């Protein structure tokens, strides 16, 4: 079941999409969008997580600039719109919004209080930043652009972190990927997977670079990671068809 909720953050209230599993008192996952806002792809990711036994919530990261952004990945004008929003995005304020969302999800009556954060592209970066700055129960980052610029904060990373990188990512150079891998290799709680031959957003549903085999592999690793790191997830998953 999907719906909209309002998150009361420290800097104001903002909207979020929520997908609930059939079995409640389930662990939560905060799903962070790309530069396209809470669009059809992000909502589909939330819906899929709900079928796997998670309370999935996608906050509107761009609410400070333009609430309710919902852009198409196939429209050039929407691409340019999203890139402009991304360039003006306040990542420091955004990390606070993500943490506030995680706190709000943990308090939902349908949530078991355990909450992971998972993001794509911009959302992948924000997953890393939130984990390093504020702490979360677990994090999953898909091809987080500009992560290499914040590796000086890796010392604050104590939560389990799973990161997926596309080896041929046109937005994350091979040199940047090497820096990310080297920095996270020092953290026993961090795992980085690389996907040979894959380009940016290979797991985006119906995206130009979507690769079914790589996406299935990455998403399977993510699901297993979430089941392992969120203690109540295993109990919930035993009652849910995955």
Task: Describe the residue ranges of each PLM region.
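N-terminal cap/leader regions of alpha/beta-hydrolase-fold enzymes
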Residues: 1-242
């Amino acid at each position: 079941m999907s719906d909209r909720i309002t998150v009361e953050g420290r800097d104001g209230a903002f909207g979020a999409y929520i997908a609930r599993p059939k079995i409640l008192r389930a662990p939560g996952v905060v799903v962070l969008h790309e530069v396209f806002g809470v669009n059809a792809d992000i909502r589909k990711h939330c819906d899929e997580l709900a079928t796997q036994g998670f309370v999935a919530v996608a906050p509107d990261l761009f609410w400070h600039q333009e609430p309710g952004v919902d852009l198409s990945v196939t429209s050039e004008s929407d691409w340019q719109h999203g890139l402009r929003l991304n360039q003006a995005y306040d990542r420091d304020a955004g990390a606070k919004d993500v943490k506030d969302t995680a706190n709000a999800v943990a308090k939902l009556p349908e949530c078991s209080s355990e909450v992971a954060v998972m993001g794509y592209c911009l959302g992948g970066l924000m997953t890393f930043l939130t984990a390093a700055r504020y702490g979360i129960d677990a994090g999953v980052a898909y091809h987080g652009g500009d992560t290499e610029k914040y590796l000086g904060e890796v010392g604050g990373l104590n939560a389990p972190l799973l990161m997926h990188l596309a080896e041929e990512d046109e937005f994350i150079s091979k040199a940047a990927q090497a820096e990310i891998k080297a920095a996270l290799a020092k953290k026993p709680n961090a795992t980085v997977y690389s996907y040979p031959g894959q380009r940016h957003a290979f797991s985006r549903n119906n995206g130009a670079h979507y690769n079914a085999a790589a996406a299935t592999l990455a998403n399977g690793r993510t699901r297993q990671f979430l089941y392992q790191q969120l203690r109540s997830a295993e109990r919930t998953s035993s009652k849910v068809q995955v």
